[in-house]
């Protein structure tokens, strides 16, 4: 069977790393991005610049590929649905529709007996005042929030002005007494067919991932519960490809699912060097119908995100043999922008 030509929507670092993994497997990639300077132009076999909602651009893209995947979840559902009518989209657009909304995402998790933080839907200021048991809490937009965007910490009901715009739809989540954050990256190939990575421990600054390490420090009980919950999510979604479930552990060692990322995940970047098969290669293998190989951890590892001007001190640095530097080749350095990462393995 010949290998498919793979279309990837999105030209950021995740698209770049997916394209690099595909090249290793001799799979041609065509990337569609609405950013003419997207870094993935340096990694894809072919690059198309254009509006995701321009039907002519979409048709040109689809003529060049056999199937489509994507690097980020905030693509409008209707766009993915239209594409899926012409060429197969994996993971399914229906999954994206569910996960794009924090309220339906949490309802899905709870329906499958997966514990989340306490939450309530918020439509106006009165809703916050009525639901003060969720304070202190985080007020989040139901859609389009990432890396801390669209989030507001609420310490009391008077923190918001009367003119605050609630039209986007919000969810208020009670803040847990946080001990640590972890993530579980899993690739599902089909019914009960998985490759799953052990939990990764994560540390954030300004609500942006700063560094990660594998293995995470935790009890076997919590580890196994997190792995089981991640598998349940993938199975119940009928997911194909790599995805991630982010978790909180509180100071009483209770586990809470925070959110689902229906794509490869920033915390999983270290798998490029820590494992024989990375999260990116497993995603390509799953969506392209290639053989599932046993994924093994070879090294413990730590990953440091290089954010904004952090990248500048690493560009001409000499690295040790156990250090691996990745420059995303973004044209412009911006504050709070992920510019690259450094992975250190323990030999």
Each language-model region and where it sits:
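Active-site nucleotide/adenylate-binding loops and adjacent lid/helix of ATP-dependent enzymes
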Residues: 98-183, 187-233
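Short acidic-glycine loop/turn motifs at beta-strand connectors
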Residues: 188-193, 250-253, 346-347
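Active-site "cap" helix and flanking loop/linker of ATP-utilizing ligase/carboxylase catalytic domains
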Residues: 224-245, 251, 261-309
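Short, hydrophobic beta-strand segments that form beta-sheet elements in well-ordered domains
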Residues: 8, 28-33, 68-71, 120-121, ...
């Amino acid at each position: 069977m010949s290998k498919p030509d793979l279309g990837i929507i999105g030209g950021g670092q995740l698209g770049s790393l997916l394209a690099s993994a595909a090249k290793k497997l001799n799979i041609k990639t065509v990337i569609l991005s609405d950013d003419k300077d997207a870094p993935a132009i340096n990694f894809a076999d072919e690059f198309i610049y254009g509006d995701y909602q321009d039907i002519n651009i979409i048709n040109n893209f689809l003529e060049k590929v056999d199937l489509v995947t994507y690097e980020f979840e905030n693509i409008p559902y209707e766009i993915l649905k239209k594409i899926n009518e012409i060429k197969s989209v994996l993971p399914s657009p229906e999954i994206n529709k569910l996960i794009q909304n924090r309220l339906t995402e949490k309802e899905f998790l709870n329906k499958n007996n997966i514990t989340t933080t306490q939450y309530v839907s918020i439509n106006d200021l009165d809703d916050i005042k009525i639901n003060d048991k969720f304070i202190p809490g985080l007020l989040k937009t139901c859609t389009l929030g990432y890396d801390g965007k669209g989030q507001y910490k609420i310490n009391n009901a008077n923190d918001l002005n009367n003119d605050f715009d609630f039209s986007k739809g919000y969810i208020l989540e009670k803040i847990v007494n946080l001990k640590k954050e972890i993530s579980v990256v899993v690739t599902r190939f089909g019914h009960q067919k998985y490759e799953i990575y052990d939990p990764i421990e994560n540390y954030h600054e300004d609500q942006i991932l700063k560094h990660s390490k594998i293995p995470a420090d935790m009890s076997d009980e919590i580890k196994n519960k997190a792995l089981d919950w991640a598998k349940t999510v993938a199975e119940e979604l009928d997911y194909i490809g790599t995805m991630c479930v982010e978790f909180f552990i509180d100071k009483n060692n209770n586990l809470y699912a925070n959110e689902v990322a229906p794509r490869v995940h920033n915390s999983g970047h270290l798998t490029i060097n820590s494992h024989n098969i990375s999260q990116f290669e497993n995603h390509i293998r799953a969506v392209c119908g290639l053989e599932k190989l046993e994924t093994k951890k070879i090294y413990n590892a730590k990953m440091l995100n290089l954010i904004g001007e952090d990248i500048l001190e690493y560009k001409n640095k000499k690295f040790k043999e156990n250090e691996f530097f990745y420059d995303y080749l973004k044209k412009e350095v911006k504050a709070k922008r992920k510019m690259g990462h450094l992975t250190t393995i323990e030999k």
